[in-house]
Amino acid sequence: LQLAFISVISSLAGGSLIGIFSLSAIKPVRWLARAYVDFSRGTPLLVQIFMIYFGLPAFFQELGFSFLLNRLLAGVITFSLNSTAYIAGIVRAGIQSIEVGQSEAARSLGLNSLQTMRHLIFPQALRRMIPPLGNEFISLLKDTSLVAVIGFAELFRKGQLIVAENYRAFEIYAAVAVIYLCLTLVCSQAISRLEKWMKWRGV
């Protein structure tokens, strides 16, 4: 849970920026943002974990710098970068769902592009983004099981360690699956309540 929450908070900020950059009128900015999204979404998450945990220290070692990433930090970096790409797509779609006429009306009132995005477009788009953002968080929560491959002691890894001690694989992995199911159901309910609250408040 710690890994998922830290990653989703950082990826919300990064994904919002990349999503806005992917709609930029400046071509190099738009191309870079979309290239980042394509790379992150087009490569396996497991490969990205190995790139960060094993590849990044090796790369810097070639440059003469020696350091090691701890497992939690490697997981946070990987999941944040990966989730940022998916959230960027959600943000981009949310912004594009707002009628173009609203931006034109804002400009006629003297608002610049930044003010229009901050005060008019993004608040409206945010409400439409809540369901897909919730789905992304749930996917991220389940994907954290992958960091077991680098030995990080999250839920799935702890299940593996217990199985290694008592060899009751079916019961242990079934219990792990039920815990993941409970976590995702709780998250789904929380997201649903947030969506209803935003509608009630007229956000």
Give a label for each model feature.
Residues 1-203:
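Transmembrane alpha-helices and adjacent helix-loop boundaries
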